[in-house]
């Protein structure tokens, strides 16, 4: 499973103006959904796969992407029907500039997750971000909508940014606030004399 830290890395790359470390959330429902999905696997093999993923995340945090990808690939080979390692490898591939490979892994993660739990939500968010970077806003919007339905606040923020009407309203509001601050092109001076009494005393 992606840690908040390695998700924040991707978040910072795509969204440098958004506060760092607020990429995605996990709740009790997510934990239960993940437990249900992981219950299909042998506990011993599952533990090995999770250990490999942790090693991969540590390597990625040390900027050793080659080792990270190797560890995630080993986890996938061990449990090819588990979505989490595809998610993690997709992020490492994206950080290496392999967008095609990242999208292939994310497509697989979405399918394997059944569009549920943390793995499904994170795959949709990551894929949506890549699609948005590629200018495929309609496809990105669909992924963000599904991720939002799974409880991702970050996906909800992306949907607002992709809404042309919201963008227009934001522009109009900004212009209106600017006019209120500077009526007739003149800035309002705080503490400026405005009363007749003040004028007479001047």
Curated annotation (Swiss-Prot):
Repeat keyword on record: yes
PROSITE patterns linked to this entry: TPR_REGION (PS50293)
PANTHER family xrefs: CDNA SEQUENCE BC021608 (PTHR21405), TETRATRICOPEPTIDE REPEAT PROTEIN 36 (PTHR21405:SF0)
Family: Belongs to the TTC36 family.
Residue spans of the TPR repeats: 49-82, 83-116, 121-154
Keywords annotated in UniProt: Repeat, TPR repeat
Protein name: Tetratricopeptide repeat protein 36
Keyword Repeat: yes
Domain of life from the UniProt record: Eukaryota
């Amino acid at each position: 499973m992606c840690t908040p830290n390695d998700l924040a890395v991707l978040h910072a790359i795509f969204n440098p103006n958004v506060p760092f470390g607020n990429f995605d959330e996990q709740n009790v429902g997510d934990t239960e959904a993940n437990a249900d999905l992981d219950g299909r696997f042998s506990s011993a093999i599952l533990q090995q796969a999770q250990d490999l993923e942790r090693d991969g995340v540590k390597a990625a945090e040390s900027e050793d992407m080659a080792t990270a990808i190797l560890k995630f690939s080993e986890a996938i080979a061990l449990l090819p029907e588990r979505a989490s390692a595809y998610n993690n490898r997709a992020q490492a591939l994206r950080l290496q500039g392999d967008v095609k490979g990242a999208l292939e892994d994310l497509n697989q993660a979405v399918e394997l997750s059944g569009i549920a739990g943390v793995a499904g939500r994170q795959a949709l968010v990551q894929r949506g971000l890549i699609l948005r970077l590629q200018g495929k806003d309609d496809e990105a919007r669909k992924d963000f909508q599904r991720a939002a339905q799974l409880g991702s606040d970050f996906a909800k923020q992306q949907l607002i940014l992709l809404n042309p009407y919201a963008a227009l309203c934001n522009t109009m509001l900004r212009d209106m606030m600017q006019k209120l601050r500077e009526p007739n092109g003149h800035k309002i001076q705080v503490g400026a004399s405005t009363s007749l009494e003040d004028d007479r005393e001047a």
